[in-house]
């Protein structure tokens, strides 16, 4: 590897910045490309959501060391940050350090990565050729040369569609004005969009339950709000997760909370409903599909929230020799550890550079993108990945091999549970707006103690968002 050239980091989220910090600690040059106007721009799309892992698991060691040198005070390790807190209190100060800020390219969308003078077919001399990063910035196509590449772009920007085929349902694209993907700011910026409306949430994971939590609170304030929950699972109890058995209590509480909403009748469940068509009917839409192999539909729907996961984008890697599992689309050696067809939660053993190694020398896919379509990624895993990868790039193979990772047990995430489980710590409060700011970004979050959007947790722990 040409040590005079920088390592190119693609992405500007927590794992990407951790990679930068690790490179700084080893006095290795880097250049980082963030497609958004601000660092960690994808996280700001779920700024209102509280993570279910505390600060202890959300900060990289090398990054903390660099910050501490400036007099920065670390947040309480047992506090669970919201997305805006993650940016405000950690990622933004990190990105503004003198060792990082000059080498961060914002509003830089990477279009292609390839070996200098090589297409995918050519082999002789390939491993010693530098990488070329083609990126668009302010309407111009630019190029940067790099010795190695760390792809930490995550999956947040490529949400899965609502259909079961993996392709958009018929009419899904045409009716996009009625659809939002991920976790909307239901109690904040998007409140008027959902208050008093007939709403469908599609999905069975943490993000779907998070949206149900926020909608349930909205319904307490606006009783005319109607909530439908569409799942592909045969029984709704399969989505309730491990509850008190989960090593992250806030994550376990999500399923308990969802069960409570169903038992109280605040959420109407449709399962297993397989959507294949959406049709506009006057000012509303109708969802068509099958339930237990029979035609089924839900009509007069105002809004749909699709929380069916996300997938990696490989389009800009077409001239590199990369490998991805054929089903999970993860780094191949991780597939059997995280495949949701095999594991309900995916507690993954510690792994590093050796498992992440690609056919293309000095190219690595890390962070949530390394997990492909699997939904169980935690930031602490990504931090250990990049520590090991950077050690290998530095030639410190001993450190790269010594992979150690402390994670909470994920608990039992797919079990048969009694439908009588409930959470007595239900609604208790009303929301009070609180103004928060990130230099130079102004945002508004909701804070209300035990039942605001700040109290509900999710699995938004990806490198560019969640």
Please provide the spans of the model-predicted regions:
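Extreme N-terminal leader/targeting segments of oxidoreductases
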Residues: 1-7, 25, 122-124, 157-187, ...
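N-terminal Rossmann-like FAD-binding beta1-loop-alpha1 element of flavoenzymes
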Residues: 4-32, 201-218
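Glycine-rich active-site loop/strand segments that organize a redox cofactor
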Residues: 36-90, 176, 182-188, 229-249, ...
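Active-site substrate-recognition segment that forms the wall
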Residues: 54, 198-238, 350-374, 378-393
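Feature captures the FAD/FMN-dependent oxidoreductase FAD-binding
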Residues: 73-148, 152-157, 276-287, 300-303
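Glycine-rich dinucleotide-binding loop and its adjacent helix/turn
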Residues: 151-221, 227, 328-336, 345-352
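A Rossmann-like FAD-binding core segment of flavoenzymes
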Residues: 216-325, 391, 397-409
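C-terminal, flexible cofactor-proximal segment of oxidoreductases
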Residues: 311, 326-466
């Amino acid at each position: 590897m040409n040590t005079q050239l920088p390592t190119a980091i693609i992405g500007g989220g927590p794992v990407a910045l951790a990679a930068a910090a690790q490179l700084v600690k080893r006095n290795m040059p880097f250049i980082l490309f963030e497609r958004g106007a601000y660092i960690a721009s994808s996280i700001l799309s779920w700024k209102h959501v509280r993570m279910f892992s505390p600060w202890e698991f959300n900060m990289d060691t090398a990054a903390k060391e660099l910050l501490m040198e400036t007099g920065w005070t670390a947040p309480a390790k047992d506090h669970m940050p919201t997305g805006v807190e993650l940016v405000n209190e950690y990622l933004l100060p990190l990105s503004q350090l003198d060792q990082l800020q000059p080498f961060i390219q914002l509003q830089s969308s990477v279009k292609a990565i390839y070996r200098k003078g090589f297409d995918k077919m050519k082999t002789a001399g390939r491993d010693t050729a530098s990488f070329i990063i083609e990126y668009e910035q302010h309407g111009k196509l630019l190029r940067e040369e790099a010795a190695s590449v760390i792809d930490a772009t995550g999956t947040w920007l490529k949400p899965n569609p609502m259909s079961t085929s993996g392709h958009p349902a018929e009419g899904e694209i045409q009716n996009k004005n009625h659809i939002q993907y991920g976790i909307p700011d239901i109690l904040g910026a998007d409140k008027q969009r959902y208050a008093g409306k007939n709403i469908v949430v599609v999905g069975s994971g943490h993000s779907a339950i998070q949206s149900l939590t926020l909608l349930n609170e909205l319904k307490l304030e606006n009783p005319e709000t109607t909530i439908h929950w569409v799942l592909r699972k045969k029984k709704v109890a399969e989505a309730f997760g491990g509850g008190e058995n989960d090593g992250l209590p806030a994550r376990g509480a999500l399923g308990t909370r969802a069960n409570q909403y169903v038992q109280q009748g605040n959420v109407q469940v449709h399962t297993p409903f397989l959507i294949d068509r959406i049709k506009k009917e006057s000012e509303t839409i109708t969802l068509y599909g099958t339930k237990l192999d029979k035609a089924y539909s839900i009509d007069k729907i105002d809004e749909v929230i699709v929380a069916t996961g996300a997938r990696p984008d490989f389009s800009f890697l077409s001239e590199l020799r990369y490998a991805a599992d054929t089903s999970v689309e993860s780094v191949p050696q991780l597939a059997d550890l995280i495949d949701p067809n095999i594991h309900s939660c995916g507690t993954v053993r510690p792994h590093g550079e050796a498992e992440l190694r690609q056919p293309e020398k000095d190219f690595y896919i890390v962070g949530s993108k390394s997990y492909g379509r699997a939904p169980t990624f935690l930031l602490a895993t990504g931090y250990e990945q990049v520590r090991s990868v950077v050690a290998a790039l530095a030639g410190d193979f001993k450190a790269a091999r010594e992979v150690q990772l402390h994670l909470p047990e994920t608990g039992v995430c797919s079990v048969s549970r009694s439908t009588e489980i409930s959470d007595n710590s239900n609604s208790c409060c009303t929301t009070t707006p609180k103004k928060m700011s990130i230099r130079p970004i102004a945002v508004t979050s909701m804070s209300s103690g035990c039942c605001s959007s700040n109290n509900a947790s999710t699995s938004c722990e990806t490198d560019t968002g969640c």
